[in-house]
From Swiss-Prot:
Family of the protein in this entry: Belongs to the RelE toxin family.
Function description: Toxic component of a type II toxin-antitoxin (TA) system. Its toxic effect is neutralized by coexpression with cognate antitoxin ParD3 but no other ParD or RelB antitoxin.
Disruption-associated phenotype: No visible phenotype when deleted singly or as the parDE3 operon.
UniProt name for this protein: Toxin ParE3
Protein's organism: Caulobacter vibrioides (strain ATCC 19089 / CIP 103742 / CB 15)
Key words of the record: Toxin-antitoxin system
Domain of life assignment: Bacteria
Alphabetical list of InterPro entries matching this protein: RelE/ParE_toxin (IPR007712), RelE/ParE_toxin_dom_sf (IPR035093)
Keyword DNA repair (UniProt): no
Length: 100
């Protein structure tokens, strides 16, 4: 089992998830959502190819849904590198700055 490595933007993404969910559903639901996302990180370390291949957006990119959020990651050998946590209701290509 590889390590989970978080890139710098992930911390801000998790803060945004908490803030957005908290505004609409309260602290308890927001905390539960963060716990779900964190559990996905550990699951991906055990099963790194579990997510969907999204090389159409960026070479090597994979995504895993924690509705409505998308965990974007790539593999680096045995390690899982978490790149971003983005809103899956929005166009991922646009959020990544890719023209469609």
């Amino acid at each position: 089992m590889g390590r989970v490595i978080r890139t710098r933007p992930v911390s801000g993404d998790l803060d945004r998830v908490f803030r957005d969910v908290c505004e609409n559903n309260g602290v308890k639901v927001a905390s539960a959502q963060l716990n779900r996302i964190e559990s996905v990180f550990h699951r991906l370390s055990a099963f790194p190819r579990l997510g969907r291949d999204r090389s159409d957006l960026r070479p090597g990119l994979r995504t895993f849904s924690v509705k409505p959020w998308q965990v974007l990651y790539r593999l680096n050998g045995e390690d899982v590198v978490i790149l971003r946590i983005l809103d899956g209701r929005m166009n991922l290509a646009a959020q990544l700055g890719k023209k469609t």
